[in-house]
């Protein structure tokens, strides 16, 4: 489709068919559009709102170009959309570490920050984790520790064509929305935080179509009702649960699981070094109650979708034990040590 026609369609608020979106994304990934046209496309698509067909079409284009990683389909991804502008620390990353300490296999897909100060890749790097392991080394790390971090640019090299425009725009785009759908390990269990409640059904449709076994799509609210793309200890959390092809909706509150409400400001993060300190403090027991409970809440849901906990309450017990017993800290130390060894071997080979 000519770019002028495409822009006019989006300006008129018209939706693209799945096949049209696949062709559009092919052109984006091939660098066929100038930066100005690409920025306009992303902004107009965001303003119009992405449909399930458009998401599926874009997914098909991007995954056709992805480098895949052979892990366990029952591993859990805790990748969220980001873009909620709350400025919190990296809750889902802390939750992934805690859940891994509880025996949950983690295949976390993530990237550097595009719309916030610190993405999951940034904070892991600040914690001493080499994010750029090749797939073979990542598979070995997962085999030995049950933890993998899948750095998006390593597995989606075609995304490089849009990275600078996304960074310059600094707004939510279809790529924020697509991120959790693009795990190169093909995981079937996910905890997905979304920045808009309208995205919940869209995710449900796409995840079911891609063979999801058990996922929780969550949209939290702060104490003022502002959007939060994590399970919220500041207000209610809306959940769309997908389990073996069945959808169910829930609304839960932090008090339901023994957590104490706090203002969103109590979960404030900072730059990568500051967020790394927060995660270290959570692991060693010196973090504030609010930050610890925010991480535990997300870790509990991670344990639940993994199948190791039969409900979120049991997940809270598993996550709390992982943290309080020191299992999470010990596990992360082992992950970092093996990660460094594998990174060193890889660098020696390429040099």
UniProtKB/Swiss-Prot annotation:
<protein>
    <recommendedName>
        <fullName>Anthranilate phosphoribosyltransferase</fullName>
        <ecNumber>2.4.2.18</ecNumber>
    </recommendedName>
</protein>
<dbReference type="Pfam" id="PF02885">
    <property type="entry name" value="Glycos_trans_3N"/>
</dbReference>
<comment type="function">
    <text>Catalyzes the transfer of the phosphoribosyl group of 5-phosphorylribose-1-pyrophosphate (PRPP) to anthranilate to yield N-(5'-phosphoribosyl)-anthranilate (PRA).</text>
</comment>
<keyword id="KW-0328">Glycosyltransferase</keyword>
<comment type="pathway">
    <text>Amino-acid biosynthesis; L-tryptophan biosynthesis; L-tryptophan from chorismate: step 2/5.</text>
</comment>
<feature type="binding site">
    <location>
        <position position="88"/>
    </location>
    <ligand>
        <name>5-phospho-alpha-D-ribose 1-diphosphate</name>
    </ligand>
</feature>
<dbReference type="InterPro" id="IPR005940">
    <property type="entry name" value="Anthranilate_Pribosyl_Tfrase"/>
</dbReference>
<keyword id="KW-0460">Magnesium</keyword>
<dbReference type="GO" id="GO:0004048">
    <property type="term" value="F:anthranilate phosphoribosyltransferase activity"/>
</dbReference>
<feature type="binding site">
    <location>
        <position position="230"/>
    </location>
    <ligand>
        <name>Mg(2+) 2</name>
    </ligand>
</feature>
<feature type="binding site">
    <location>
        <begin position="90"/>
        <end position="93"/>
    </location>
    <ligand>
        <name>5-phospho-alpha-D-ribose 1-diphosphate</name>
    </ligand>
</feature>
<dbReference type="GO" id="GO:0000162">
    <property type="term" value="P:L-tryptophan biosynthetic process"/>
</dbReference>
<keyword id="KW-0822">Tryptophan biosynthesis</keyword>
<dbReference type="InterPro" id="IPR036320">
    <property type="entry name" value="Glycosyl_Trfase_fam3_N_dom_sf"/>
</dbReference>
<feature type="binding site">
    <location>
        <position position="80"/>
    </location>
    <ligand>
        <name>5-phospho-alpha-D-ribose 1-diphosphate</name>
    </ligand>
</feature>
<dbReference type="GO" id="GO:0000287">
    <property type="term" value="F:magnesium ion binding"/>
</dbReference>
<feature type="binding site">
    <location>
        <position position="120"/>
    </location>
    <ligand>
        <name>5-phospho-alpha-D-ribose 1-diphosphate</name>
    </ligand>
</feature>
<dbReference type="Pfam" id="PF00591">
    <property type="entry name" value="Glycos_transf_3"/>
</dbReference>
<keyword id="KW-0479">Metal-binding</keyword>
<feature type="binding site">
    <location>
        <begin position="83"/>
        <end position="84"/>
    </location>
    <ligand>
        <name>5-phospho-alpha-D-ribose 1-diphosphate</name>
    </ligand>
</feature>
<feature type="binding site">
    <location>
        <position position="230"/>
    </location>
    <ligand>
        <name>Mg(2+) 1</name>
    </ligand>
</feature>
<keyword id="KW-0057">Aromatic amino acid biosynthesis</keyword>
<feature type="binding site">
    <location>
        <begin position="108"/>
        <end position="116"/>
    </location>
    <ligand>
        <name>5-phospho-alpha-D-ribose 1-diphosphate</name>
    </ligand>
</feature>
<dbReference type="InterPro" id="IPR017459">
    <property type="entry name" value="Glycosyl_Trfase_fam3_N_dom"/>
</dbReference>
<feature type="binding site">
    <location>
        <position position="166"/>
    </location>
    <ligand>
        <name>anthranilate 2</name>
    </ligand>
</feature>
<feature type="binding site">
    <location>
        <position position="111"/>
    </location>
    <ligand>
        <name>anthranilate 1</name>
    </ligand>
</feature>
<feature type="binding site">
    <location>
        <position position="80"/>
    </location>
    <ligand>
        <name>anthranilate 1</name>
    </ligand>
</feature>
<dbReference type="InterPro" id="IPR035902">
    <property type="entry name" value="Nuc_phospho_transferase"/>
</dbReference>
<keyword id="KW-0808">Transferase</keyword>
<dbReference type="GO" id="GO:0005829">
    <property type="term" value="C:cytosol"/>
</dbReference>
<feature type="binding site">
    <location>
        <position position="92"/>
    </location>
    <ligand>
        <name>Mg(2+) 1</name>
    </ligand>
</feature>
<feature type="binding site">
    <location>
        <position position="229"/>
    </location>
    <ligand>
        <name>Mg(2+) 2</name>
    </ligand>
</feature>
<keyword id="KW-0028">Amino-acid biosynthesis</keyword>
<comment type="subunit">
    <text>Homodimer.</text>
</comment>
<comment type="similarity">
    <text>Belongs to the anthranilate phosphoribosyltransferase family.</text>
</comment>
<dbReference type="InterPro" id="IPR000312">
    <property type="entry name" value="Glycosyl_Trfase_fam3"/>
</dbReference>
